[in-house]
Amino acid sequence: MGGNEAQNLAAIQRGFEAFAKGDIETLKTLFSPDANWNQAEAGVLRGNYRGVQALLEFFGQLAHETEGSLRVEVLTMAASGDHVLVFERVTGERKGKTLDTKEALVFKLDSGIVTEVTELQSDYPTAAQFWS
């Protein structure tokens, strides 16, 4: 399990770059076939997304719900064993509402491939209001 920390950090960095560009083909290569994304916030996107296709649909729904305005800025990234922690700023607009919040993503990897992601909000009420 795990792989080395540098390999895991590089994989997550590639993922953020691919997400920003809408590079679906690269994103597909970074997740295990049964990867799980736990989206704990309230609102239309809450839930667990399992499998590459479900994750890609989730990413597409993020873009759709925000009419392409969603932006993610990585503030810091750190690796420990088979985990990478990303602290990020997320901005966007949706149905006349504006989002500007910070959140943490905890990625679990196996040899540079993401197997699990847990998303944690720093301001749950703001995120819940935006996505409701």
Where do the PLM segments sit?
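Short beta-strand segments that buttress and anchor functional surface loops
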Residues: Q61-L62, V86-E93
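A short, polar/proline- and glycine-enriched secondary-structure boundary/capping micro-motif
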Residues: N48, G96-L99, T126-W131
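Short, low-complexity N-terminal intrinsically disordered segments enriched in polar/charged residues
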Residues: M1-P33, A128-S132
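Beta-strand elements of well-folded, non-transmembrane domains
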Residues: A20, G92-R94, S111
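Hydrophobic/aromatic beta-strand elements that line small-molecule binding cavities or substrate pockets
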Residues: V72-M77, R89-T91, K102-F107, T118
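Short, solvent-exposed coil/turn segments at beta-strand boundaries
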Residues: D34, A79-H83, F107-T115
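A solvent-exposed, acidic/Ser-Thr-rich amphipathic alpha-helical stretch
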Residues: K28, S32-A79
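Short beta-strand edge/turn micro-motifs at domain boundaries
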Residues: L105-A128
